[in-house]
Amino acid sequence: PKDYYNEKSSNSVKIDTNSNKAINKAIKKVIKKNKLLTNQNVKQKLTDFGIKNKEEKILIRTEFGDIKIRLYKNTPLHRANFLLLAKSNFFDSTIFYRVIRDFMIQGGNSDKNNMLQKMAKIGLYRVPPEINSKNIHKRGALAMAVQEQYYKDPTKINLSSSPYNFYIIQKGPLSDT
C-alpha cells in the first residue's frame, strides 16, 4: 500500500524534534522584513503563508515513534500557523510536557530559554478562533490550546488560540461542555 505520509509528497511536512535545520526561506523573509506576527497582522500574514504552503499532512517524529497528523483546510489560519512553526523548526527539541491519561498530550512551547528566543523571532500574537462543528475532538485530533490568561478570568473569555501550544486528543470524542 502507498504510504500516505510519504516524505516526498508536496502536501506533507516532517517535524523532526531532534534536528537543527536551517530556517525555511519563507520564514527568513518574514523575519528580515520586520514582519513579526502581531495580533494586528496575524490574519493577513497567516493567510498569505497558507496560500504559499499548502501542506495538509504532518509527521511528528519522537523518540517513542511517529505521529501522523492531518491539518484541516477549513481552519486555514491554524493550519498555516502550525506549518509556519514547523517549517521554522520551532518545535525541534521541544517536548510533550503535559500528558493526561485518556484525555490528551500537550506540546509545543516549554519553559526552555531557547523557546523565548524562538518566539521573539516569530512574534507575539494569538490565532483568531476558527470554530467549526465538523471538526470533532476525537482520538488523534490536533488542536491549539486556548491562551491561558483568558480562561483564568471568566469575564474576559477569548477563544483565540495560543500559537505555540498544541495538543493531541488521546480519547474521544470530547464535548465543549
Question: What are the functions of these language-model segments?
Answer:
Residues P1-T177:
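Cyclophilin-like peptidyl-prolyl cis-trans isomerases
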